Regions:
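Cytosolic covalent-transfer regions centered on His/Cys nucleophiles
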Residues: 1-159
Length: 159
């Protein structure tokens, strides 16, 4: 499938899905804002997207550490993997594994049947965003174009 050939973060995120300075005060508010953006981009119901994300969060936080969260979920009738990236104005508590507040969030939605592709995408996103050099560039970028350029500049060949 898609991930067996090549993966760049820009294969998941269109320029309109990059939020350079999201002002939120809580994990719930962040998920609501990102769900709204993802729903608009995917042509889905905002409530449906938020519910999928909240169901996943109830299983355990998607705050992976180092100031990064990767909320994700699967949706029926979604055509392809799709994402939204946001740099938060101020770090928030995301109940991350390392207890650190989160300021970089990559929301990933996958088709219900994505299976291994969904897991591979999550692993690659985590690996790329936890790279200190990439994370620093993302934190220093102040507009959507600059953030998208950082995301576009980092890809990985499938293994």
């Amino acid at each position: 499938m898609f991930w067996t050939i090549f993966m760049a973060l820009t294969d998941l995120v269109v320029p309109q899905a990059v939020v350079p300075s999201l002002r939120v005060n809580s994990k719930k508010q962040a998920l609501q804002e990102l769900a709204a953006r993802a729903a608009a981009i995917c042509g889905r119901n905002e409530r449906e997207v938020l519910e999928v994300l909240m169901q996943r969060e109830r299983l355990g936080s998607t705050g992976v550490g180092s100031g990064i969260a990767i909320p994700h979920g699967k949706l029926a009738r979604l055509e392809r993997l799709s994402g939204v990236f946001a740099r938060l104005e101020r770090p928030i508590d995301f109940e991350a594994l390392d207890g650190q507040p989160v300021d970089l969030v990559f929301l990933l939605l996958a088709p219900e049947g994505a299976g291994a592709d969904h897991l591979k995408a999550l692993a690659r996103i985590a690996r790329l965003l936890r790279d200190p050099e990439i994370a620093q560039k993302l934190r220093e970028s102040r507009d959507a174009e600059a953030l998208y350029a950082v995301l576009a500049g980092h890809s990985t060949k499938a293994s």
